[in-house]
Amino acid sequence: MPSLKALLRGVLVAAMLVAGSARAELNIEIVGGGASRHAIAVVPFKDEGPTQGNLTPVIRNDLALSGAFRLVDPSAVANVPFVPADVRYPLWQAAGAQSIAIGKVENAAGGQIKISFRLMDVSQQKQLTGGEFTVTPDRSRQVAHAIADLIYEAITGQKGFFNTRLAYVLKSGRSYALQISDVDGQRSQTILRSTEPIISPSWSPNGRYIAYVSFASQKPVVWVQDLATGQRRAVANFKGSNSAPAWSPDGSKLAVVLTTSGNSQIYIISADGGAARRLMYNGGIDTEPSFSPDGSMVYFVSDRSGNPQIYRVPVNGGDAQRVTWEGNYNVSPKLSPDGKTLVYIRRAAGNFRVMSQDLATNDTRLLSDGSYSERPSFAPNGRMVLYSSDAGGHSVLYAATADGSSKVKLAVLNGDVQDPAWGPFNNP
């Protein structure tokens, strides 16, 4: 079984060797689904189109991605309603739809468009939610995500996450690109491009900044970049290696891993940089810090027991407590937004899989298959887990429901993706 030092070397090697060309477009493919999904029909909106905004494909993709919905084909029903009065409920009930989303697009003053939508309960024949949005046509995609959020919340009772963003690193030839995109892969932006590895992107809690590690200085340095202005600053450039940035929940601090004392150890620094405070004193290797949602604890990986395991320690220092006990190789911890569930990577029988652990009961659940999965992170509502994994010779994005009931593949066409991170609700 490899040591934690070998694991750290492996992370660097993987960052330098992931190959393949990449495009920003994602292709959503349903690869598994639970039996209890809500059946919904999303009828094409009246007068939507390329210039007015193709809304329904975005809404359908969002709902499919969530794993909570089963899409009913509206073309099989002899009813195309745009307003509630036109819905013929018996036809939709016969088609197996539990709810139906309808809407229309109209021209508005100043070159804007007005998008109206309603979500109707088929059995009760009443409106569940709805809304109207007046925007410029180029904002129609964001409106479609907002509509999907409203539908998701009306059906599940949980806040939707479709207007959040993803960050990930793409490798094309000898070029690395740190990118952000919508949850469906559209509106992608390259934040940084380099011929040297870029790893470990981490979102600030307000969504304005991304911390990451760049090797452009011929060694790992932690940077923080303002997404609005593009300005960046080195916040950890100490002697030796600087890596694994993780934001505190209030955005004021970063946990980082430094080798200034020899072995990899966890330090706390200001988000603006400055002096580093060592969190613990341990003769082994400590790495991959992650704050608890309330900011009181730091979860991390250590080889102090002989093999890589996950521990937690108070943010102001103290005794570390071991968290994972099953298996002898557990890394990459991330906490759910409510602090009740931990996801991480376990190595078993030569395969690296995403695991979920209830922190109250210590019960575990397998969330991924494939031979090599990495870097799990929760959606901001805690209902989905994002990670990358191997598929067909490439590394692609997957999103699994937190209960393991369904999974979707978000394949970057003709490319490989690594180090994904799901952004927060309050994106700018």
Question: What kind of feature is each model-predicted range?
Answer:
Residues 166, 207-210, 251-255, 295-298, ...:
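Hydrophobic beta-strand positions that form the internal "hydrophobic ladder"
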Residues 111-114, 174-179, 219-223, 263-267, ...:
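Structural motif
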Residues 182-199, 225-243, 269-285, 313-329, ...:
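Multi-bladed beta-propeller domains
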Residues 20-24:
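Sec/Tat signal peptide C-region and signal peptidase I cleavage site
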Residues 26, 84-150:
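Amphipathic beta-strand/beta-sheet edge segments enriched in Tyr/Trp
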Residues 30-90, 101-107:
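Short beta-strand->alpha-helix linker/helix-N-cap micro-motif
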